[in-house]
């Protein structure tokens, strides 16, 4: 601290001396000006210009510290001095100096021996001083004492090696000692201070350089470390990526290997399958070749047998001709032998001779019994009904039952094989066959069962007329047979009818080769099964035909057995549905039906005419109700054609239905018969006659009132018998593979104890109002209903014996989707009846949906709906019976006007679209516009998307359908008619919605009714 204060005082003294020296020239006038200091040497200027040129400062225009590091000036002592000189010159610490600044700075420092602060001219000293200054000797020439003092001073300062020119300091020191000795001490202090500062700056520089070198080394080390770490991280990443790539490659390789192995196994399996298929194909080819060869052999055998058959027929014709000739020749011989028989003559037994041993008529001897012979060779009368058999005749069996399929193999599908009135070839045996146990003769009643005399009046279907000259069709029995079975044409067999000669026998007669069997084997298991016990006179056995006695093969059934046996099916007996007949046949049918109603013996004969079988009388045909003969002429059908079985026939299974009832359905003329004739119906089992007459009148009235409702039904009736193969198979009776009948239907066949008599009726027929209340289906429904399952025509539950007045639906039995109660005909008294119309574009699946809903089966070959179709669906929802009249409309544009007409009375509408067709979904709004144009505001609407099974081809999402349904405020759902998914649920929900809407409407009506306008009082009140 003291040293610093002393130094500052010395500086102030030095400054004061300077100020005094500067003022001296101004004070002294006329003083001479001091000479100019020593100028900047030309050598230094040349070195400076060379320095500027070498370091490039001349081009740049400035000088930096780095440029001075390589500079070599003669006036500088060392490299450190050059760096320090830059610090002296760079006062502003900019780091760079221009050429002028650097040159002026150097000149100020090294240009003169004077201090850079003494720039002005001083007043010239007195002559003594000038002379002394000029005469101041150099350091070498100075005194030793002064020289030692100066050297000691320099050693004290320690700056001898730092200053560039010691001579200048010597001169300055000497000058100060001579001129101003008081400033010598200040010079020493100044030099000491500057030296210390230079030393401190040098030390700081060295420290900074050391720190810089250390920082540089640390920086290089850190950079190297970071570089090494980065390299190591890069190597690790590369190794990791390589490992992942290798593992992925191994996994893909193993996966591809597994796939290749699986493909190879599949190829091997396919190759094995191909080899197996080739083996099967070769086996099938060989089998086909064998079958073809066998077929060819069978064809040859068939042709051979046909030739033999023609040959036998020719021989038979020749035999008949010879027999006729023999009759004419030997008639007198027969009379003579009958009048005078020989005592020793023995009549040969014709039964003992075999067919091979029977001689021709021309080869007979004189002792032969021609009467017996002629009776054996009797031919059927002209005009008798003939049957054309498709299978070859089989030999008679002595015992054992016969399957019903043989009966249904009668082929009458080719009625044009013989002309009307032409007699086809009869049985190869040449003799007509009578029914088992019954023989006819012109002389006596040989072979007739004792019970035949008792039941002959009750069996009009058996023509036992003793008069041989009477025509078969002239008797009441014949006409009744014609009226009953003239239209009994089932799909399994048909009858070729000669028009002029007489009516045919019943179509339910057994074939001529029906085997003999005991009466215990007679069972009424199926009304269509023509077993050994169900018999009728065949075509060849006519009364009075002149046939000789034949060996009886079976006794006729007794009274109990006949009551047990099912008669002709009520379906075929009542409807008369058959193939298209010529007009003359229909006229004959019309005349015989009218003639039947006028016979006096009808009341007695119809007592046991028909035994009603199970509710499925003939599964090959659709039961369409009674068809009046007047409608047959006009080509129309009654309204009950589509209504199912009439109420008069919906009785318990096994109950006997009289001919009075039966005749009341086809025509109204029988309604005028006296009740005394109807009172003779002993086979009704105690049924009330008043209910029968009311039933007849109701049915006849219904047929009469609906005479003009359904035109053009003739084509419908003609098309019904064209049964499908399935219907023909079903018509052949029950097979072991068939399932039992559904619940609610009585069992097939006769009930235990049915032989004692018919069962009692359980319920009276419906009234006229009930029949009129039932909805009548449209014209297009008959063919669609014909294709339905056989169990869809079950009898009503009212006819069950266990609960006469309770329906299965009313009892709480919820029908399943396949239950016939759920899809049967409409109920007589349903709880709710609604009209539901299906709308949508063509080919969206409306018909398939309704077919699946009604038939429980998906049909693949349905054609487009023409106009409109109609179905009735009965549902039990929440213990309520719903009858839904489902209208299937056509989606084609040409039928839209008809669809709009139907929308006026619709209670519910199902808008159906195809989820695989965006166009059908877009057309939903068009159908809604049609619905609004029709004025149906309060209609319950269901938006239904079909074909959920085609999910891959879906174009309309579920969200789009839900959004549209929310926008329109309707119900929404999706279904699949092909898979049967969500079929019944939307219909059930629709029925509930319709019921809620109707109940709400009723409640609103109840609420509105009490609100009456207040009574107006008079003006005086």
Curated annotation (Swiss-Prot):
Cellular compartments per GO CC: azurophil granule membrane; plasma membrane; specific granule membrane
Mode of membrane association: Lipid-anchor
Residues noted as binding GTP in the record, renumbered to the chain: 840-847, 888-892, 946-949
Compositionally biased spans, kind Polar residues: 688-697, 710-727
Keyword Nucleotide-binding in record: yes
Molecular function terms, GO-annotated: calcium ion binding; GTP binding; GTPase activity
UniProt family annotation: Belongs to the small GTPase superfamily. Rab family.
Protein name: Ras-related protein Rab-44
UniProt organism field: Homo sapiens
